């Protein structure tokens, strides 16, 4: 359907299809925020820097034609191989860009659209912007149903794209051309809003995409979305400062909001001025350099003994840009002091008020600097400082022991792989991971040296995120070496975007650890009475269980077949050489290493705090009975902070 041209088309309007108008509009959207340091000029960048796409009948003649006609100067196009992976790549780009620049993703209708759901959930949970443009069924319904349409007997206006509603921060379906104008503006508002941002979905019926309309020229004017830095309320700030001054054992928890706000320097200034120790969530790690005296490492179930011991005795917890997930709070068992109080600095009121806290609803950088000024002259007791610094030194010795590999001729453990990588990377390298046993080891062991070096997606902990995210990070930071760390389980979930990295000439590096199964869940299964059932990649044994020989799968050959250069490392010595070569490589390179597993050789220190994974309330197998007894003992320590 094409809307008839009107005489006004010659006076301040432009005749374009809906898809062409959307692409043109996106090419003129910008964000602006002040610089990362005082006195720096505001930085302006494209809000939507590029569009990923896989084309089918639901978008090829609409968005596809519009991208072709507009050209890369208006909207660069990136070709993906899997729709979920395209969202992961866009999310990696947005995170590396401090949420100031994002990417769009276009798909066809049907399975291409539903493949977006997992990536959308990841983006929304992590508060990272991505614009989703799935094709949709005909608005005019000339034939009903069309190819790949879901028929819902009780609702004719439902399509599979409605699956995206609960995982989107804004959802709209464009049934008419003129509806695009308010919808597109609302979409940009949400993407640029540090409180509301996440996945934004504009579902585009395939007939509407191709419909021509006379658009007002003002719709295509350059538009700047300014990202604010709201300051904390004066009364709340004074109350927070009083709480800090009264505390004897305060602890700061740095979350991802510190990075999103570029507040690392402000956090360091507060720690330097007051001596308050700083622990970090997975998203916040690297907010202080690992060698800063106040940095006590990761906190919670995957945290260090230093941070977790401080949390157990803290009488005041200052959360900065954190959501307090169960991994951070050890499932509500970590903050054990009977009188513990909370001060939460967060740009989102929803998060600032958690745990009955004194809420500082503000930008992290603005709030930290205001709190530092309010606390002028205040420092914690020297004995408290000396105690946590001594504990930090003891933990560093444990990290050294986990990294140590004195015999270069042996096959490495996972922690020795991390030690070898630690010795090779520089301050500007980026390390990406999301799932498996690596997040726990990295949170405890990795020595983060710069902002945005440590890139862990642990809001959704999505297997398959790492490789496409590495592509997005490399696009956002072309001068930084980017490493995706994956086990064989994660690799098998989503290796397809290796082809995209090869096509784009992006020199990402993959460290592929082969341990023949799901190591993390295998360990969790053993701890909860499951006896590692169903977690190994092995042939069936005589009893029908997967306990036979390892499967003869060559993942290194698979990576090579997709276009990567592959370096095989059988020993610690070969691993060090391969990592050095990979870092210098100018094309996609994979380092493949088979590791000794944690149940056969010592690795990273065990978990320092609990995580609530309910165990069978009744069972006949002794392992489950014993695991339930331990579960009941741990669960008794849970508490609500009121």
Model-derived regions: residue spans:
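N-terminal alpha/beta PP-like core and its mobile active-site loop of ThDP/TPP-dependent enzymes
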Residues: 2-379, 383, 420, 424-427, ...
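Glycine-rich beta-strand-to-loop/alpha-helix junction loops that act as flexible
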Residues: 254-256, 320, 435, 486-489
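Pocket-edge structural micro-motifs
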Residues: 79, 204, 280, 433-435, ...
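Conserved structured core elements
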Residues: 16, 20, 45, 261-264, ...
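Phosphate/pyrophosphate-binding active-site segments
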Residues: 2-4, 10, 175-178, 216, ...
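Short amphipathic alpha-helical interaction patches enriched in hydrophobic/aromatic residues
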Residues: 168-171, 403, 563-566
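Thiamine diphosphate
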Residues: 141-154, 352-353, 361, 368-369, ...
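Active-site diphosphate/adenylate-binding microenvironment
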Residues: 51-63, 392-469, 473, 479
